[in-house]
Every structure is written in C-alpha cells, then in structure tokens.
C-alpha cells in the first residue's frame, strides 16, 4: 500500500487538520499508483487529497480534474458513499478513517 508523504507547508495550523483516509483507485488509474487499488493518503479535504495524490502519483491529477482544477464530469468522488457534488465539492472535509472512492461514470443505451 502506498502512503503518500505530506507536502511541506509553513502553516502549522494546516497540519492540525490533516486526516489519514483510504482512497479507492479505479482500475484505469492504477497505472499511476503502481498497480495499487487502495492508497492511504493524508488530507483535510478532497481538494487537498487530489493535490496529495498528484504529489505522490505524478500525472493522476490531469486524469481526475479538468483545466480549471474541478473534478472531471465523468468521474464521481464519494466520501463514505456520499457524492461530494451534494456535499461541499472539493471543499468536503475529511475525517480520520474516511473512505474516498473515485468512480468512473457508467452510461449505456
């Protein structure tokens, strides 16, 4: 299991809010995580989680976010089975032990 390192920041208050969460990585993105389906990561919210993933799995953010840094429309992010679109988006707070699932949208016809 990959455990990304924390970015070095000068604001000590930032570190007080960091939580370790489990991130479930879909198969198409596992090439960025050395084949790992689950990663433990440290972040205070979903936006910081995406940045931490990018810092430790270079190139993954371009697959997760559009040019404006917003989650791509065809990917759904869930925190403990709750869609972040109905919470606070990338500002959705994370707590220790939370599970974040990244799920590609499925469509059919």
From Swiss-Prot:
Q: Which residues form the signal peptide?
A: none
Supply the InterPro entries for this chain.
Beta-grasp_dom_sf, Mopterin_synth/thiamin_S_b, Sulfur_Carrier/Prot_Modifier, ThiS/MoaD-like
The GO cellular component terms are: molybdopterin adenylyltransferase complex
Q: Which GO terms describe its biological process?
A: Mo-molybdopterin cofactor biosynthetic process
Annotated coiled-coil positions are: none
Which CDD domains does the UniProt record give?
Ubl_CysO_like
Q: Which family does it belong to?
A: Belongs to the sulfur carrier protein CysO family.
Protein name from the UniProt record: Putative sulfur carrier protein slr0821
Q: Which organism is it from?
A: Synechocystis sp. (strain ATCC 27184 / PCC 6803 / Kazusa)
């Amino acid at each position: 299991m990959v455990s990304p390192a924390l970015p070095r920041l000068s604001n000590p208050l930032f570190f007080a809010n960091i939580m370790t969460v489990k991130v479930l990585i879909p198969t198409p993105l596992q090439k960025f995580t050395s084949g790992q389906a689950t990663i433990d990561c440290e972040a205070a919210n979903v936006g910081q989680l995406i940045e931490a993933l990018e810092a430790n799995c270079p190139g993954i953010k371009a697959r997760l976010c559009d040019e404006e840094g917003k989650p791509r429309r065809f990917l759904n992010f869930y925190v403990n089975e709750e869609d972040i679109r109905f919470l606070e988006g990338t500002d959705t707070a994370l707590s220790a032990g939370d599970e974040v699932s990244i799920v590609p949208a499925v469509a059919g016809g």
